[in-house]
């Protein structure tokens, strides 16, 4: 399958993290950013991650992203992108002060209402050291990871998830106040059923596609294969018609009103799902694998999902890989770079030592980052 390339040709930051002003002029090649810890390498990756909907790879409070000491009250990011819909100039940042801070987006200089429109132009995926504990951490971290995987294939998923959370909070509030008004609750629960099943089915379908791709690559991959499954909501029933599932979940919510009121929360729904990952070759739960095996599993999973995104959209995603080479031996590093290059997209990688990326050769542009300054 022919994969089209999406690439950034220019990135410009103002009052973003430790950068008063910074600019990168890029070609289509991969980008390697090296420098000491704390110099601002990850901040550059975070800036690129803001070219996708959401709060970036750190899930930052937007007001915290503005440079300390900045005269203005916000930050701005500009990027020229050869994207899925041709060349586009993207500008994003925040406006407002104090309590009311909102993200703004311009495409080719024209304001747009929703940052979701970014997915018409590029898909951005990332892997950071903060994700290394994914398999041993909380189920909420794994759900967030799962939903980001879905989002790259189904851009409407994030909106449905936030609408579901909003409806669920409304139901919880009514129940906590003892207001069992059937008209109010029936309306909210109908909305929750439609949104919740839509979320659950989107996760189920994405995971099915990802499992098929991983199984097709098993045995000839540089990184171990993962076996994936979901549990916690409508297990083994998500292949049924959505209308039947909505009726079933709606009934579940109605029957659980008094129980949920006593618990102080909604006990059934897509917000209770967990992602289970096993090391396929060892038939072992990921959380029981060594730290090195967990990292290799996660790298393999993210690369497989990047390939799936390319297959499904026809465009390779932009990959952000923070400290990606730090815990890999030389052979596995070289294999990783070959896999990344074979995806056909542009990736941004960080590390403390440029020598760790030598296997990339001419396939990458190298930049040195030093406390707010960037040199080629």
Curated annotation (Swiss-Prot):
InterPro entries: AAA+_ATPase, DNA-binding_RecF, DNA-binding_RecF_CS, P-loop_NTPase, RecF/RecN/SMC_N, RecF_2. Coiled coil: none annotated. GO terms for cellular component: cytoplasm. It is found in: Cytoplasm. GO terms for molecular function: ATP binding; ATP hydrolysis activity; single-stranded DNA binding. It comes from the Bacteria. Its main location: cytoplasm. Pfam families: SMC_N (PF02463). PROSITE patterns: RECF_1, RECF_2. ATP binds at residues 35-42. Keywords: ATP-binding, Cytoplasm, DNA damage, DNA repair, DNA replication, DNA-binding, Nucleotide-binding, SOS response. GO terms for biological process: DNA replication; DNA synthesis involved in DNA repair; double-strand break repair; SOS response. SUPFAM superfamilies: P-loop containing nucleoside triphosphate hydrolases. HAMAP family: RecF. Belongs to the RecF family. The RecF protein is involved in DNA metabolism; it is required for DNA replication and normal SOS inducibility. RecF binds preferentially to single-stranded, linear DNA. It also seems to bind ATP. This is DNA replication and repair protein RecF.
């Amino acid at each position: 399958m022919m994969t089209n390339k999406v690439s950034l040709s220019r990135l410009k930051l103002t009052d973003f993290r430790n950068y008063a002003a910074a600019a990168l002029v890029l070609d289509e090649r991969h980008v390697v950013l090296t420098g000491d810890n704390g110099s601002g390498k990850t901040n550059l990756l975070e800036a690129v991650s803001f070219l996708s909907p959401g709060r970036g790879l750190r899930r930052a409070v937007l007001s915290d992203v503005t440079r300390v000491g900045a005269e203005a009250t916000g930050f701005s990011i500009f990027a020229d992108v050869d994207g899925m819909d041709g060349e586009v100039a993207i500008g994003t940042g925040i406006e407002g002060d104090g309590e009311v801070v909102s993200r703004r987006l311009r495409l080719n200089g024209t304001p747009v209402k929703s940052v979701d429109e970014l997915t018409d132009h590029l898909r951005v995926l990332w892997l950071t050291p903060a994700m290394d504990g994914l398999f041993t951490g909380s189920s909420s971290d794994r759900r967030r990871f799962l939903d980001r995987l879905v989002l790259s294939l189904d851009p409407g998923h994030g909106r449905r998830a936030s609408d579901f959370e909003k409806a669920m909070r409304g139901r919880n509030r009514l129940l906590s106040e003892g207001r069992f008004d059937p008209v109010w609750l029936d309306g909210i629960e109908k909305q929750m059923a439609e949104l919740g099943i839509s979320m659950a089915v989107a996760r189920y379908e994405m995971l099915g596609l990802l499992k098929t791709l991983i199984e097709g690559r098993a045995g000839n991959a540089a990184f171990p294969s993962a076996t994936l499954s979901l549990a916690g909501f409508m297990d083994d029933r998500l292949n049924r018609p959505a209308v039947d599932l909505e009726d079933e979940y709606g009934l579940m919510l109605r029957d659980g009103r008094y129980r949920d009121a006593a618990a102080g929360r909604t006990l059934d729904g897509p917000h209770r799902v967990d992602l289970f990952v096993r090391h396929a070759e060892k038939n072992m739960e990921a959380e029981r694998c060594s730290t090195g095996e967990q990292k290799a599993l996660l790298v393999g999973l993210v690369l497989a999902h990047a390939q799936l995104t390319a297959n499904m959209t026809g465009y390779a995603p932009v990959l952000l890989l923070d400290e990606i080479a730090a815990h890999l031996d030389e052979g596995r590093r070289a294999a990783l770079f070959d896999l990344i290059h074979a995806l056909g997209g542009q990736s941004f990688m960080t590390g403390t030592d440029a020598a760790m990326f030598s296997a990339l050769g001419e396939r990458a542009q190298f930049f040195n980052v030093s406390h707010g300054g960037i040199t080629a």
